[in-house]
Swiss-Prot record:
Residues 346-582 form the ABC transporter domain. Signal peptide: none annotated. It is found in: Cell inner membrane. In MsbA the ATP-binding domain (NBD) and the transmembrane domain (TMD) are fused. Pfam families: ABC_membrane (PF00664), ABC_tran (PF00005). Its EC number is 7.5.2.6. Residues 32-314 form the ABC transmembrane type-1 domain. It is a multi-pass membrane protein. This is ATP-dependent lipid A-core flippase. Involved in lipopolysaccharide (LPS) biosynthesis. Translocates lipid A-core from the inner to the outer leaflet of the inner membrane. Transmembrane domains (TMD) form a pore in the inner membrane and the ATP-binding domain (NBD) is responsible for energy generation. It catalyses: ATP + H2O + lipid A-core oligosaccharideSide 1 = ADP + phosphate + lipid A-core oligosaccharideSide 2.
Length: 589
């Protein structure tokens, strides 16, 4: 099944926003408190504007000493109340926004772990990190931070307009004629922001992916002198990101200038009409100051409401990217057959498998039986389908045709968790997590293993000889991806993990291919302790390591072209004999 990671199909902004607001429901009490506080804050702003009339008329025109004494106290009280309300609004909205970002990250991370393996082939990990990182933050900003700005500024604009209507409805209605023009500008700005936001987020993911590839392969980059090439490639992506960012700045600048121009026209209209009203004796100096300061409050409020469109549209674009993950189908998991501990009988019946977007199948009509307690070796040239075959057993991928059976039942008949509980995997590239040795061996469902079980597994894997020399023993940290340990040490910890799991099916994917002779000897010895009484499938690069396998499957171009024991295949003089002869000559050279 092909999984696309292209830009999500556009949906209505309101539909996306409504779905996004569902994540705010657990924090509705906080949001209600923030709304009430925002109303008080807006009332404080409106109250201060209303004081402009007595300040002007009573203090400067009528010289009223009594009013002049209590006005400063009122102003201080207003701003104290307004400041407290603003603090409550910021804290309540901030807590809600950060909580929504956390909830989204956890939900999307959990979803990624339920997606089929093909998703991880079609979407690079840096893109996933962008979704879990900046996308989640921008969604939180759209869901709450933008709402905070819109509520605060809208209430202040409404309060200022109400005050203007109270003092002179004629002047106010003259200014409101400009409202349709302003609404048109804000709509255009919102549409442009949304278009650019999709592109800039995709550009950010490409930048992160390019950096990840270059830095992860820094040794190859240096040894082949590719620094200039990689910097040119990264620079081109960075320049594209810059161009998109400048489009955002250009849109913001033009929209701000347009809103300010509309505000200037409104201010000019106010001066003209208010002057006429004053000449007719219908406006006092205090009324004019109230109208003027209210208008000067409205203009920056409108500017912020226009600029917040960028935050909203980027958040909505991020929300669509996150929802595209959340809406992706999980791994199929409809199995109902109970499975406590399998016997380990594995059978492939005419299995064909194909990767998404590939014309040629990775596997074609593959059939074999692995009896319980036996060792099945799988060999062949690079790209012959060996790894594809073993990935089908734990259902990391699904077969296109044919059946894979465990103990006589199709693997789809079992629940995924039950099926995977029967399998231990030791690969060439061992993944250790940033934690202690004990945490990495007693991993996942084995985390409650007792100290005796853990020690026996480490001893059996020939790992105790280096673990005992570490300052903190089992509690020693292995570093990111096990970076503090050698390849052989990591491999032995992976074997210890498999020993502790004690699964009836063991998969070894070229477990000794990249090791030196001494490390290989220790790992091979540990594997020989691990393999008895299990159904073992071994992908082998070094054919000398599988001479005692119960059966050897030789693969080429996705098909099993030879099968038999080591000695039978050598006697046939086919592909296996050819590969064995090549390795023998290499060792002799």
């Amino acid at each position: 099944m092909t999984i696309s990671t292209d830009r999500p199909a556009p949906v209505s902004s309101w539909r996306t926003y409504r779905r996004l607001l569902a994540f705010a429901k657990p924090y509705r009490l906080l949001l209600v408190a923030a709304l009430i506080a925002a109303l008080i804050e807006a009332a404080g702003t409106t109250g201060f504007l209303a004081l402009m009339k007595p300040i002007t008329d009573e203090t400067f025109i009528y010289k009223n000493a009594e009013v002049s004494r209590w006005l400063p106290v009122q102003i201080i009280l207003l701003f104290v109340v307004r400041g407290v309300a603003g603090y409550i609004t910021d804290m309540a909205m901030g807590k809600s926004a950060r909580s929504i970002a956390r909830d989204l990250r956890i939900k999307v991370m959990a979803k990624y772990l339920r997606l089929p393996g093909s998703r991880f082939d079609s979407e690079p990990v840096p893109s996933m990190l962008i979704r879990l990182g900046s996308d989640s933050d921008q969604v939180a900003q759209a869901a709450v931070d933008a709402v905070k700005v819109m509520i605060q500024q809208s209430l202040q604009v409404i309060g200022a307009l109400a005050l203007m209507l109270w003092h002179s409805w004629q002047v106010t209605l003259t200014i409101l004629v400009l409202a349709p023009v302003l609404a048109w500008v804000m709509d255009k700005v919102a549409r442009r922001y949304r278009r650019i936001s999709h592109s800039i987020q995709e550009s950010g993911a490409q930048l992160l992916q390019a950096a990840d590839q270059t830095l992860s392969s820094h040794q190859e980059v240096k040894i082949y002198g590719a620094q200039q090439t990689e910097m040119e490639r990264y620079g081109a992506l960075a320049n594209r990101n810059l161009r998109l960012a400048m489009k955002v700045e250009s849109t913001r600048g033009i929209s701000t200038a347009t809103v300010q121009m509309i505000g200037a026209i409104g201010l000019s209209a106010l001066l003209f009409v208010a002057g006429a009203q004053a000449l007719a004796g219908r406006l006092t100096a205090g009324d004019f100051v109230v109208l003027m300061t209210s208008m000067l409050t409205i203009i920056p409020g409108l500017k912020q409401l226009t600029n917040v469109q960028n935050m909203v549209q980027r958040g909505l674009a991020s929300a669509e990217r996150l929802f595209s993950v959340l809406d992706s189908p999980d791994e199929p998991d409809q199995g109902t057959v109970p499975l406590t501990r399998a016997k380990g009988l594995i059978e492939f019946r005419d299995v064909t498998a194909r990767y998404p977007g590939q014309v040629n199948p990775a596997l074609a009509d593959v059939s074999f039986v692995a009896q319980p307690g036996t060792v099945t070796a799988i060999v062949g040239r690079s790209g012959s389908g060996k790894s594809s075959l073993i990935k089908l057993i734990p259902r990391f991928y699904e077969a296109e045709a044919g059946q894979i059976l465990l103990d006589g039942h199709p693997v789809q008949a079992y629940a995924l968790a039950d099926l995977r509980r029967q399998i231990a995997l030791v690969g060439q590239q061992v993944m250790l997590f940033d934690g202690s040795i004990a945490d990495n061996v007693a991993f996942g469902e084995m985390r409650n293993a007792d100290a005796g079980q853990l020690e026996r597994a480490i001893l059996g894997a020939n790992a105790m000889e280096f673990v005992a020399q570490l300052p903190e023993g089992l509690q020693s940290h292995v570093g990111t991806k096990g970076g503090r340990l050698s390849g052989g040490q990591r491999q032995r910890l992976a074997i210890a993990r498999a020993m502790l799991k004690d699964a009836p099916v063991l998969i070894l994917d070229e477990a000794t291919a990249a090791l030196d002779n001494e490390s290989e000897r220790l790992v091979q010895d540990a594997l020989h302790k691990l393999m008895p009484d299990r159904t073992t499938l071994v992908i082998a690069h070094r054919l000398s390591t599988i001479e005692h396998a119960d059966q050897v499957l030789v693969m080429d171009q996705g098909r099993i072209v030879e099968r038999g024991t080591h000695h039978q295949l050598l006697a046939q003089g086919g592909l296996y004999s050819h590969l064995h002869g090549m390795q023998f000559r290499e060792r002799q050279a």
